[in-house]
Amino acid sequence: MPLGHIMRLDLEKIALEYIVPCLHEVGFCYLDNFLGEVVGDCVLERVKQLHYNGALRDGQLAGPRAGVSKRHLRGDQITWIGGNEEGCEAINFLLSLIDRLVLYCGSRLGKYYVKERSKAMVACYPGNGTGYVRHVDNPNGDGRCITCIYYLNKNWDAKLHGGVLRIFPEGKSFVADVEPIFDRLLFSWSDRRNPHEVQPSYATRYAMTVWYFDAEERAEAKKKFRNLTRKTESALAKD
């Protein structure tokens, strides 16, 4: 969906007439040319600086192998950005626009009530066939309901470079291949409706992801975590 210059964006219209219907009908959608060349370049340059300065670390697996680095399963390198850090003005601007889009979606997202989101996860697949095996962002009710990914890869040719995000929409007879091209913004449900994988990348591949939380599910997840922590500490104390 080409959007043109950022100053002409009608974010509310995009949210209500495009994002909301697409999420409910197919579970995902994307916007192309979201920031425009100039602002998108500023985001890309900052991400490259983070990469070249050694700020990125191997991505970790969640679930039963939480905290474990398995490069053959997940090959990205990541760091977390709030947007207020020095030199991250363009990233902060991007995040503010995504926030507004999600805000405009509002109650039309169904059962979800979004009050907060994660920091931005800056990710780099360094090439050499690195990818991320099929998985679900939120399989166990941790509160994440919407995944937003902003891609930063100029002159990307999926036939040469790979790196396609393949989505396996639940209950659908098709798969969806999303190429990680520069200035593309993807929205999708975070739960089991959208299993997905990052196919092997043969060139440096950059992306930035934020997750929006449903307030009730997030509060319940935090409560369960606190209870588990207390039980673990109590068991260790008895030993």
Swiss-Prot record:
> Could you give a GO molecular-function term held by this entry?
peptidyl-proline 4-dioxygenase activity
Expression induction per the record is:
By PDGF and angiotensin II in aortic smooth muscle cells. By deprivation of NGF in neuronal cell cultures. Induced during coronary heart ligation.
Query: In which compartments does the protein localize?
Result: Nucleus; Cytoplasm
Modification after translation is described as: Ubiquitinated by SIAH1 and/or SIAH2 in response to the unfolded protein response (UPR), leading to its degradation.
Where do the record's region annotations for Beta(2)beta(3) 'finger-like' loop lie?
A: 62-73
| Residue intervals of the Fe2OG dioxygenase domain | 116-214
The reaction(s) annotated as catalysed by this protein in its Swiss-Prot or TrEMBL entry are:
L-prolyl-[protein] + 2-oxoglutarate + O2 = trans-4-hydroxy-L-prolyl-[protein] + succinate + CO2; L-prolyl-[hypoxia-inducible factor alpha subunit] + 2-oxoglutarate + O2 = trans-4-hydroxy-L-prolyl-[hypoxia-inducible factor alpha subunit] + succinate + CO2
For biological process, the GO terms are:
apoptotic process; cellular response to hypoxia; cellular response to leukemia inhibitory factor; DNA damage response; regulation of cell population proliferation; regulation of neuron apoptotic process
Question: Where is the stretch described as Required for interaction with ADRB2?
Answer: 88-104
Q: What's the cofactor?
A: Fe(2+); L-ascorbate
Give the note describing cofactor binding and stoichiometry: Binds 1 Fe(2+) ion per subunit.
PROSITE patterns on file? FE2OG_OXY
Q: Name one GO cellular component term.
A: nucleus
- What name is this protein filed under? Prolyl hydroxylase EGLN3
Task: State the organism of origin.
Answer: Rattus norvegicus
Taxonomic classification: Eukaryota, Metazoa, Chordata, Craniata, Vertebrata
This chain is encoded by the gene named Egln3
